[in-house]
Every structure is written in C-alpha cells, then in structure tokens.
Amino acid sequence: MNLLDPFMKMTEEQDKCMSGAPSPTMSDDSAGSPCPSGSGSDTENTRPQENTFPKGDQELKKETEDEKFPVCIREAVSQVLKGYDWTLVPMPVRVNGSSKNKPHVKRPMNAFMVWAQAARRKLADQYPHLHNAELSKTLGKLWRLLNEGEKRPFVEEAERLRVQHKKDHPDYKYQPRRRKSVKNGQTEQEDGAEQTHISPNAIFKALQADSPHSSSSMSEVHSPGEHSGQSQGPPTPPTTPKTDIQPGKPDLKREGRPLQENGRQPPHIDFRDVDIGELSSEVISTIETFDVNEFDQYLPPNGHPGVGSTQASYTGSYGISSTPSATTGAGPAWMSKQQQQQPQQHSLSTLNSEQSQSQQRTHIKTEQLSPSHYSDQQQQHSPQQLNYSSFNLQHYSSSYPTITRAQYDYTEHQGSSTYYSHASGQNSGLYSTFSYMNPSQRPLYTPIADTTGVPSIPQTHSPQHWEQPVYTQLTRP
C-alpha cells in the first residue's frame, strides 16, 4: 500500500539518524496497529501518530506524543511526509450512498473505543509483538471488568467527542454498510437444511423459513436451545429432524406413496438415491400386503421388454407374502415385475407366472386362486389353468415353509436347461416361489431366457416354462 512507503523510508532515515531504539515501536504504532475509529485521516496532519487519538484529546497526550520520539525522528518524519504527494493516495470511499466524491466521515468513538484506542497505543509501545486481535479481545474483557467509576472518564470523553462531532458534521447520518455476506450465509444454511437433514441449527432455521405458512408465531424459534417453538409449529412441518424421519421412512414406503404428496413439501428424499436395502427384512416382514402398483412409477418404464403390455392383467395379484419371508428368514418375495416380463415369451409363459404366483399366495389369500382371478387368460387355457391352481394348493403347501436359504442359491446352474428338466417335479415350485430375494442377494439374479428343451416336460407333472420367471432386480429409476 502506498501509505506504508513513507514509513519504510522513515525507518531508514531513523537508522541513519541516531537512535534505533524507538524505531520498532514507532513503526509498529503507525503501520501495525490499526485504529479503526480514529477520527480524521492522515491527509490532515504531517504527524500520523497524532491522528489515532481524537482531535480534541487531552493536551497532555499530545505532549507525551511529541516527547516520545527524539527531534531527529520527528524531523525525518516531516521531511518524508513533505516530499510525498498525498493527493495520490486513494481515499477510502464507501460504494453505497451518494457520498462517492466526499471523504468518509467516521462515527464518533464511544466510551469503549476511547478506552481501547488509548490502551492499545500504550500496550503496543510496551509489547510491540502483541497480536492485534488478541489485544482487542483482552481489552474487551478488561472493559467489562471495569466498574462505573473507572469507566466514567472514558464515558465523558466519548460524550464530548459526540458533541464535537455533531458540531463538525451537523448533517451527519450513520449509514452502516449492509452485511450481504452474512445474509447469504444464512440462506445457504437454510437451503442446506431443506435438502439434507444435518444439524439441529439448520433444522430450526428451516422451521423459521417456513414460519409464514404456519398459523402460530414462530418468533420464539431463535436457537436450537429453545424448544418452545417446536410445539407451536405447524402440525406437519415440511422439514423434520433426521431422528424423526428415519422411523418415518418405512411408513412412507409402506403406504407406497412418495413424500412429495404432502402439499408444498420440498424434495427431501430423492428416490433415485434411496436403496431398497434400507428396508431391512424385519421391516418388510411386518408389512401387510399392499398394492405394489404405486411402486411401478419408480421403476424404469422401458427397462424390460413387454412390461407395459399386460401390466393391467396382473395388478390384482401383486403383493408381498409375509409368510415366506418369515419362515425362510430371507427377504420378501417381491412379485412386482416378474409377472410383467413373461408375456414376451409365448402364451403359456403367462400360465406359469399365474401358477407360481398362485402357489406363492397360498398362505395369504386363497381367494386369489379362484378361477375368477384368471379371467384374462381363461379364454385361452381354461382347462389347464384350473388344473394348475388346485395342483399348487395340494402340491406346494406342504413343502413350501421348509425352504432354507441354501436351497435357492442356485445361480451357477442357471444356464443349463438339463438341470431344470430333471428337477422339474417339486423344485419348480420351490424356485419360482422366491422371485425376489433379500437385498444381499439381489445382484445374483439375471434373466433366464433359456427355453430349450422345455416343451418336453410333461404338462401334468410341472407347468411349462417353469424356469421362465425372470429374476429381476429392482433398479433405481
């Protein structure tokens, strides 16, 4: 900065002159110790040291100022300052306001500033290496410890300065600069609170941000320490703390509806980021059968061929069977997309999906095995259909609960149709039961499209295409 150049020259001349002892303190005073509220600028005086004190300060202080430095140093300072063109120094200008061409008029110092300036000057002389911020903190602590009697001279001096300032600048009006940065920080924190439920601070700020919508006054909600505002808030505030949302997450999924249905709710949970692994098997085993149809809006529409063609014909039989997941200890048997994929094969494959589905529901809804459920396909294969449904009830219900995890880890055999054809009797029902394994096994299952050799299987022994149910992964949309 240009202002420091004269002081650098000044210190050089002091070294030439005589005593180097006062020079560090003087250069520290003039350059190092910022006195923010000193009245007046360096342009008005040839000695900048005097300007850190108020104009009409005690004469005693000015005398001590003059006595502080030897005559040689004072002459060197005045010589340097004379040789410098002070009109070249840019004046500090406040951008907002019409006073761009006028020099900035500082506020009159209050009592604490009078004390801090005088004490800072004294301490900076004695301890030139004190950090200015630490010095300010210490001065503030000391000021709070002073009693009224000790503060009185500073209060009187501040009052005198205020009166003098009013005389000098009768039309002075204090116009503080608006702190845009702080407000931006607050709004950023509020935005962050609406997107990620991180800190209670951010949650309370978000509650404050939503307070115009609530009927009660949220003015009490200033800090997370005051919980009075929490009880007075809206009955279902859009941003709830994370501790509330985690038990709530399975509930929202249990109802099968997105979070965004609650009116003006900000998008807290992006379903693309939600792993179904969060729903543990215990949670899903407690879920009653519900319509998985609403989940299909989160599944990729074009992910598998033939999904949309017969979607309507299977909606009645979707569901999660809680009995198999309870007996096997494995994850739920999700049926949502298995049936939708089979129409891409020929028409008998739909029979198998109905068959496997009906045997899957034997413990839960036996009314779904009635012929009325299969009305869509009954025109084509009505004799076989009734045969299969009764066959499922008597054939699979005995062996169904005894399945263990080891029985369906069969992914290494997926390619060979010979394995399936000789095991066609009972295993067909066992394997088609678990169309959706628990989350840890999800990546193992790939679509089985190998239909070779299947028509040779006898119809009465097992349904055609029994390896046809495609084991799908519920991928994120």
Curated annotation (Swiss-Prot):
Disulfide bonds listed in the record: none
Where the record places motif 9aaTAD 3 is 428-436
Which residue ranges does the UniProt annotation give for the motif 9aaTAD 1? 276-285
**Can you supply a Gene Ontology BP term from the record?**
growth plate cartilage chondrocyte growth
Q: Where is the composition biased (Low complexity)?
A: 27-42, 211-222, 370-384
One Pfam annotation, family name?
A: Sox_N
Domain comment, in the record's words? The 9aaTAD motif is a transactivation domain present in a large number of yeast and animal transcription factors.
Task: Spell out the protein name for this chain.
Answer: Transcription factor Sox-9-A
What is the species listed in this Swiss-Prot or TrEMBL entry?
Xenopus laevis (African clawed frog)
